[in-house]
Amino acid sequence: MPFNKHAIVIGVGPGLGAALVQKCVREGMKVSAGARDRDRLRNLLDERGLHEVPALACDVTDPASVQSAFDDAIADAGTPDLVIFNASGYARGSVLELTPGQLEAAWRVGCLGGFHVGQAAAKAMVGAGTGTILFTGATASLRGSANFAPFAIAKFGLRALAQSMARELGPKGIHVAHVVIDGQIGEAEGDAKLKPADIAEAYWSLYRQPRSAWTIEADLRTWVEKF
């Protein structure tokens, strides 16, 4: 049943991003979805039966693109109550062979992009004194594995951003949380991978938390994952 709330999900692809959009729609929210390639996003949303969800062009590395996406979303559906940053810059390779450009590209999407989206979300929410901002992390948020320096650097930085924003914005009524996805995401049979729909349920629980018991960081993994 609709309850007149607005969610903006940035970094929507066929896995977790689409599952987050679907969950918010099922719960009755007005949802705006953003990704770098608007046409591809529109096709994905239509394939999932999400015809009513606007597809926004949003290059998270470009602050003007992010602000334009937020302006369009807010004009269409009002101030966001929930913003999810789900974009990620993935790169791997030996530190002996990686180029500065590869490292910077991963950081610009995964960390700087989080700043652009988080800042736009905070500016939209602060006047209302309420809202939730969620950042998607990974195992690499906590551990830099061999050959994953660019990804880990971006994810470490995103986690630091989320922590800083949580401490600054919490007293202003805005709930900021970082979610560590500790494992691979997919629809494989059994429990070897985290299922997108199940992760989306966890995000929804964070959004619905009462102010007296906010989670600032959550880590999700399958029951068979070693940690």
PLM-predicted stretches and their roles:
Residues 94-95, 102-107:
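Substrate-binding pocket helix/loop in short-chain dehydrogenase/reductase
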Residues 13-14:
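Conserved glycine-rich cofactor-binding loop
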Residues 132-157, 163, 170, 185:
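Catalytic loop of short-chain dehydrogenase/reductase
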Residues 27-43:
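Conserved glycine-rich Rossmann-like NAD(P)H-binding loop of the short-chain dehydrogenase/reductase
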Residues 57-69, 100:
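The beta1-alpha1 cofactor-binding region of Rossmann-like NAD(H)/NADP(H)-dependent oxidoreductases
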Residues 118-119, 163:
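A short, exposed helix-loop element centered on a Lys and neighboring polar residues
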Residues 171-227:
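C-terminal helical subdomain
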